[in-house]
Amino acid sequence: MSRRRGPRRRGPRRRPRPGAPAVPRPGAPAVPRPGALPTADSQMVPAYDSGTAVESAPAASSLLRRWLLVPQADDSDDADYAGNDDAEWANSPPSEGGGKAPEAPHAAPAAACPPPPPRKERGPQRPLPPHLALRLRTTTEYLARLSLRRRRPPASPPADAPRGKVCFSPRVQVRHLVAWETAARLARRGSWARERADRDRFRRRVAAAEAVIGPCLEPEARARARARARAHEDGGPAEEEEAAAAARGSSAAAGPGRRAV
């Protein structure tokens, strides 16, 4: 069974901190702060008569006394006031500022601004370390040579110079590729080099086999083989001895390097 909760109690309202700006309530008339600049919403008009300023304005709000004008019921017509405007300004006594325009209330006096600090004279510069000085010098020389090379017109070849087989465009850039020595050698030789090595190896093996099998394929070796086969079929010991003697004689005639089969 769920517990029933009563109405939520609200705690005490937080009081604004001292010195925090007051937030105006919605719908309340906006009151300009002392020293604030006039805005488009306030529609302030300069007061030509200091006596018509708002008397209820605080003493610290000099902006309201200077700019705010409250119209009265017994004001004369605008046309009459406009006609006497030049005469009133001509007969009006000079202001306290000596004819100068009044300074804005928000503008700070010139005496209040602190003078700019005097510039410190730079002393003699410290010498650079050797490696930095060398690098600076080489960089300066390189930039000077580069600028001189850019200013100099490109050298054109003479007319009687022999023309090469290949003419590169000035836009072509040649970049040297770095390759391993083995890869470069194989690229120069190609696949035919390996095929030639294989053919040489096969030729040597065939020659070695012919040196061993060649004596067995000669006519004399074949005749001895036939005689030995007949003697074996007949079974006579005399014929076997003759075949063995003939084989020994043929091996002696062939030489020590050859072997009779």
Curated annotation (Swiss-Prot):
InterPro entries: PPP1R15. Residues 163-176 are annotated as: Binding to PP1CA. GO terms for biological process: response to endoplasmic reticulum stress; symbiont-mediated suppression of host autophagy; symbiont-mediated suppression of host innate immune response; symbiont-mediated suppression of host translation initiation; symbiont-mediated suppression of host type I interferon-mediated signaling pathway. Residues 1-59, 75-135, 145-164, 223-261 are annotated as: Disordered. Keywords: Host cytoplasm, Host nucleus, Host-virus interaction, Inhibition of host autophagy by virus, Inhibition of host innate immune response by virus, Inhibition of host interferon signaling pathway by virus, Inhibition of host RLR pathway by virus, Interferon antiviral system evasion, Modulation of host PP1 activity by virus, Repeat, Viral immunoevasion, Virion, Virulence. ICP34.5 is detected as early as 3 hpi prior to viral replication but reaches maximal levels late in infection. ICP34.5 gene is therefore classified as gamma-1 or leaky late gene. Belongs to the PPP1R15 family. This is Neurovirulence factor ICP34.5.
